[in-house]
Amino acid sequence: MKDETLLIKGCLEGNAKMQKCLYDTYASKMFGICLRYANSHAEASDILQEGFIKVFTKLQDFRNEGSLEGWIKRIMINTAINFCIKEKKHFTTDLDNT
C-alpha cells in the first residue's frame, strides 16, 4: 500500500518514471480486460490507451477506499463499455445508410 501511495504521489507530481511504472504495472492485466470487450487487438489497444488517459487525468480523484488496481479496472471496464456503445451506434448508422 505504501508503494501505491508513493506511485500515485509521483504520478500526480508529473514524474514520468512513476507514470511509466504505473502503466507497466497494470497495462498487461488491463489489456486482458479490454480484449473481452473488443473485436480485435487493435480495438483493445485503443480502449487501453483511452482508459489510461482517463486514469492519469482522474488520478487525483482516487480516494484509497479500495485498491488502485480495482479503481483502474473499473475505469477500463467503463471505457470499454462506452467504446462498445459508440461502435454499436456507428454500426447501426452504417446499416441505416445502406
Model-derived regions: residue spans:
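Amphipathic, Lys/Arg- and hydrophobic-enriched alpha-helical face
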Residues: 23-41, 58
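Short, solvent-exposed positions on alpha-helices
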Residues: 17-21, 42, 46, 70
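Sigma70-family region 2
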Residues: 12-13, 52-67, 86-88
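Solvent-exposed, non-membrane alpha-helical residues enriched in polar/charged side chains
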Residues: 8-9, 20, 31, 35, ...
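Structural recognition of an alpha-helix C-terminal capping motif at a helix-to-coil junction
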Residues: 32, 46-53, 57, 66-78
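Arg/Lys-rich amphipathic alpha helix in sigma70-family domain 2
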Residues: 60-63, 74-94
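N-terminal module of bacterial RNA polymerase sigma factors
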Residues: 1-29
